[in-house]
């Protein structure tokens, strides 16, 4: 029997000198305890040149054995005894093969592993899309947590200095001011130029001197400042997460990001599960994506369906006038459908298509909101200049035209009067006829009753 042994460097054939030992599988491993006992099996050349007719070939992979049997007409066997035999050969391979060292086999194994990795391991966008979905979910959680903490800071510090909420309306700046100031008495001696503008700083210092609210202990101020640290830490994490999300969206869906922004694009991908699923949707579905509950409720109650869903938060839709939001949302959804398919099915695409579509939509928005009005104003100015120059010449024709119009209106009135009269007479006749019928019916019913 011959044994085919596979390595990263090639193939090796071993011949079983004593096939009787294969009958006892448990004692087969004792033949490979030392290199001297394992070396008794000789080394042969490659398979086709050294396998004689009638030889049985032991292989580790049954699929490989089937291929060898089909191609070379060599009988192959695979069982527990063969696996134990190959395990012993593997343990003493460097001693069985002359001139082979572990250092020689390691580079070949590394190269083979790299080749297999190229075929088996493939970096796809699914992993990145999963990170986008998790990032947008984490961003929503950070927003909720940030709102909760900032509300707590405003409520707690408002007992001590309520005027600060009206002076500093930004939550992050509010937390920075509270952390730096502590007690409101310290505001007069502190420098807020790195945080606030000069006017706001002067107003803050003036309000701190006038405020007469309750005092707080140092322990309470310390807890409030620790809460401010949490607010600033969450805000910093949110900024880093937004930057990372923007980079990922520019790599996965650059055209969609150029049209609707990274946040809206990420929410659309998260709503559908992947960019591939989003690319299968028509533009009409993309337009109302995220407003499914409102849509089903409107269809059930037979009311007006929603015009937009998640796409409402896109910059182009937000900056449009209320009467133009529906038109811009419809156009943006159509362009977004093309951009999504370009990102999903294109290889190495940039954001050229998305930028061009955005410029077209911005031009359309300008035309809807003010382009036509400007053209009309120019025409009116030109007409005013012409009328000023030719005022004297046009006075007589205008009076003649006015008199002609009055004559035509008078003629139309005279023509329309008989028609109006005939219509009125017809209506009165119908009313009289209905009155007579009702009277006849009334008298007939009374006679039957009597």
UniProtKB/Swiss-Prot annotation:
Where this protein primarily resides, as one coarse class?
A: nucleus
Q: Does the keyword DNA repair apply?
A: no
Biological process terms in GO annotation: ribosome biogenesis
Task: Give the location in the cell.
Answer: Nucleus, Nucleolus
Protein's name in the database: Putative nucleolar protein 5-3
State any GO CC term: nucleolus
- Compositional bias (Basic and acidic residues) spans? 399-423
- The gene it comes from is NOP5-3
